[in-house]
Swiss-Prot record:
Pathway named in the protein's UniProt entry: Isoprenoid biosynthesis; dimethylallyl diphosphate biosynthesis; dimethylallyl diphosphate from (2E)-4-hydroxy-3-methylbutenyl diphosphate: step 1/1; Isoprenoid biosynthesis; isopentenyl diphosphate biosynthesis via DXP pathway; isopentenyl diphosphate from 1-deoxy-D-xylulose 5-phosphate: step 6/6
Family, similarity comment: Belongs to the IspH family.
Record: residues binding isopentenyl diphosphate: 41, 74, 124, 222-224, 266
Protein name, per record: 4-hydroxy-3-methylbut-2-enyl diphosphate reductase
Gene symbol of the encoding locus: ispH
Catalytic reaction(s) noted: isopentenyl diphosphate + 2 oxidized [2Fe-2S]-[ferredoxin] + H2O = (2E)-4-hydroxy-3-methylbut-2-enyl diphosphate + 2 reduced [2Fe-2S]-[ferredoxin] + 2 H(+); dimethylallyl diphosphate + 2 oxidized [2Fe-2S]-[ferredoxin] + H2O = (2E)-4-hydroxy-3-methylbut-2-enyl diphosphate + 2 reduced [2Fe-2S]-[ferredoxin] + 2 H(+)
Length: 306
């Protein structure tokens, strides 16, 4: 049996930055440091930060006035920012710069009096943050079927943006449907789906062609991790999304010769290592690393935390 590791996998630059912001704030200001929403969607990461003194909350009214709060990598609405300022909170923004780019795009589009269609998953915090960049003039769609039902005020002045962690293939289908229904619609100058999402999905496509089972390390509330599983399944390969090695069922491994392993952008490499060791303990499998893109991207921390 062979374990094949996808490349790239695991942490992206936005996740590394978000985690570093929480850790640096704890070092500089001490516990507790409040974080609005899970800073990244990974149970292992959040449990580790919680043990160090981070307190995760869903709404700012859970944060005592005058405290330090960090916005998660997924971004927040303008209303949340205004609320934080009104309550005198010291804010550090861990929003991924690639999500911020989408927020800026929405602002420019609305300033041009264009309505904006966002392609994304309803209820996801990134979508809520991006939709909250404008009071009105925005629509949310997830599928081509929803595009067919969409009614807008002015089809001639319409733009679209996307959630950064979508399936590239699924997003393309929805974008094509938008362009067919609204021929004058305009998109961003550069694709909103982030480099890490694209690279990890491409790596899984390669991996799926070499494996009869794919394990995606990531939490179930991680959008990009779920998309990786979907990409593998779309290549007609059995795939499972797991938080940690202990979730692996031995029955999955029976009769398999090549087991692919990857990780979502919010999953640390230590979890991948646990999965590899667990499979090796059960099967004695060898390990092969696929070649892939060397990303080499990093984002700076806020000045006050340097």
């Amino acid at each position: 049996m062979e374990i094949i590791l996808a490349n790239p996998r695991g942490f992206c630059a936005g996740v590394e930055r978000a985690i570093a912001i929480v850790e640096r704030a704890l070092e500089k200001f001490g516990a507790p440091i409040y974080v609005r929403h899970e800073v990244v969607h990974n149970k292992f990461v959040c449990d580790d930060l919680r043990a160090k003194g981070a307190v995760f909350v869903e709404e700012l009214d859970e944060v005592p006035a005058g405290s330090t709060v960090i916005f998660s990598a997924h971004g927040v609405s303008k209303a949340v920012r205004e609320d934080a300022e009104a309550r005198g909170l010291k804010v550090f923004d861990a929003t991924c710069p690639l999500v911020t780019k989408v927020h800026v795009e929405v602002g420019k589009m609305r300033n041009q009096t264009r309505e904006v269609v966002m392609i994304g998953h309803k209820g996801h915090p990134e979508v809520e943050g991006t939709m909250g960049q404008s009071q009105g003039g925005m629509y949310l769609v997830e599928t081509a079927d929803e595009v067919a039902q969409l009614q807008v005020s002015d089809p001639l002045h319409l733009s679209f943006v996307t959630q950064t962690t979508l399936s590239v293939d699924d997003a393309t289908v929805v974008i094509d449907a938008l362009k067919q229904r609204f021929p004058e619609i305009q998109g961003p100058k550069k694709d909103d789906i982030c480099y890490a999402t694209q690279n990890r999905q491409d790596a899984v496509k390669e991996l799926a062609g070499k494996c009869d089972l794919v394990l995606v390390v990531g939490s179930p509330n991680s959008s990009n991790s779920r998309r990786l599983k979907e990409v593998a399944v779309g290549r007609n390969v059995m795939a499972f999304l797991i938080d940690d090695a202990e979730e692996i069922e031995e029955s999955w491994l029976r009769g398999k010769q090549h087991i692919g392993v990857t990780a979502g952008a919010s999953a640390p490499e230590t979890l991948v290592e646990r999965v590899v060791m667990h499979i090796q303990a059960l099967t004695g499998a060898s390990v092969t690393h696929l070649k892939g893109i060397e990303e080499g991207i990093s984002f700076p921390l806020p000045k006050d935390l340097n």
